[in-house]
């Protein structure tokens, strides 16, 4: 029986449309010859729309997006939009509305990829970052703004419900991986209230996963080990803020954000999950065919894996690995990279 994937496509700004086009090209190649088809719907969201209409993400947009199986996002933003407008009005609004409580960031050092590490080693881990709590919920404020007595605060929200569900997701992922190891990263010696909630939750849920080895690192120690011994990590679970910082460091040691894919996941599947490259819109090279679409292609692999199409996802990942090994220092256009990856996936 034929299966159809109803995919929302938000190409966005800058290089977004270019890399998304190549991601869709590889997606089509991965599904060719299968009983799975893709139906795409494009959405005009991002800086261009904000400049034209002042809108970021309307209730009508959310209602329409909610009907899809998944969302593929390119990149959002340009220098002409004030900081925070699109981040909060579009990306975070979408994350909270669709309860994307797992932010998934795989970090793998592919053979042939340049790294600042003296010794690369077998680096292959995933960060499971809580996505809907912490200090990003907007629970804070400021008074006496602009005076010498200004007071500003941001309150980090951590609920037992929210922490348990992301910890449970992380344990399930660790249990499904060969190494079966989970590392909690926090700072419970100083952030005693939230930190110990996370610690107790990991201990409680961990009892249900006896095959998964568990350890703990303070966040400052974790940054050291990410640079000196990243191969020690398998699955890392952490809160929203620490995860935001650690995942960019993880990208830096595994080839940069140009290779970094991500998924904003609703594991309950009550809403569509969203998949996107980590890099920005890079307006300085937009329209020039210089952008590397590899991170978008790897995001497509995450999308397929989330939808249960693991064989097709693995083919894309294998194609990327082979392409990276063989590309060397060759300079290729965005479309040429996409063509090469699509050809490898098609076999």
Curated annotation (Swiss-Prot):
The keyword Amino-acid biosynthesis applies. GO terms for molecular function: 3-isopropylmalate dehydrogenase activity; magnesium ion binding; NAD binding. Its cofactor is Mg(2+); Mn(2+). Its EC number is 1.1.1.85. Pathway: Amino-acid biosynthesis; L-leucine biosynthesis; L-leucine from 3-methyl-2-oxobutanoate: step 3/4. It is found in: Cytoplasm. It catalyses: (2R,3S)-3-isopropylmalate + NAD(+) = 4-methyl-2-oxopentanoate + CO2 + NADH. SMART domains: Iso_dh. It is an enzyme of class 1 (oxidoreductase). Binds 1 Mg(2+) or Mn(2+) ion per subunit. Pfam families: Iso_dh (PF00180). NAD(+) binds at residues 280-292. Mg(2+) binds at residues 220, 244, 248. The record marks 136, 187 as: Important for catalysis. Belongs to the isocitrate and isopropylmalate dehydrogenases family. LeuB type 2 subfamily. HAMAP family: LeuB_type2 (MF_01035). This is 3-isopropylmalate dehydrogenase.
């Amino acid at each position: 029986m034929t299966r159809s994937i109803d995919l929302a496509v938000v190409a966005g700004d800058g290089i977004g449309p270019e890399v998304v086009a190549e991601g869709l090209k590889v997606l089509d190649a991965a599904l060719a010859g299968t009983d799975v088809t893709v139906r795409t719907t494009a959405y005009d969201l991002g800086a261009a729309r904000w400049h034209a209409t002042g809108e970021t993400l309307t209730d009508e947009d959310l209602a329409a997006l909610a009907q899809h199986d998944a969302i593929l996002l390119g990149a959002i933003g340009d220098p002409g939009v004030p900081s925070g407008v699109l981040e909060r009005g579009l990306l975070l609004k979408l994350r909270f509305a669709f309860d994307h409580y797992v932010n998934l960031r795989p970090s793998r050092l592919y053979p042939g990829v340049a790294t600042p590490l003296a010794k690369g080693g077998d680096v292959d881990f995933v960060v499971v970052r809580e996505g809907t709590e912490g200090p990003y919920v907007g629970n804070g404020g400021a008074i006496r703004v602009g005076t010498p007595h200004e007071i500003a605060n941001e309150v980090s929200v951590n609920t037992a419900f929210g922490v348990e569900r992301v910890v449970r997701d992380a344990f399930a992922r660790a249990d499904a991986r060969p190494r079966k190891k989970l590392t909690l990263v926090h700072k419970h010696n100083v952030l005693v209230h939230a930190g110990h909630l996370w610690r107790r939750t990991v201990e409680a849920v961990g009892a249900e996963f006896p095959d998964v080895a568990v350890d703990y690192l303070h966040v400052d120690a974790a940054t050291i080990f990410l640079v000196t011994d990243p191969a020690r990590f398998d699955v890392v679970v952490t809160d929203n803020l620490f995860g935001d910082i650690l995942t960019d460091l993880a990208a830096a040691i595994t080839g940069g954000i140009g290779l970094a894919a991500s998924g904003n996941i609703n594991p309950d599947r009550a809403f569509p999950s969203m998949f996107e490259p980590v890099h920005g819109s890079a307006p300085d090279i937009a329209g020039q065919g210089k952008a590397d679409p590899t991170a978008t292609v790897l995001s497509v692999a995450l999308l397929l894996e989330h939808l249960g199409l693991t064989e097709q996802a693995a083919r894309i990942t294998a194609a990327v690995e082979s392409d990276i090994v063989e590309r060397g220092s060759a300079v290729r256009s965005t479309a040429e990279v996409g063509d090469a990856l699509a050809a490898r996936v098609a076999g």
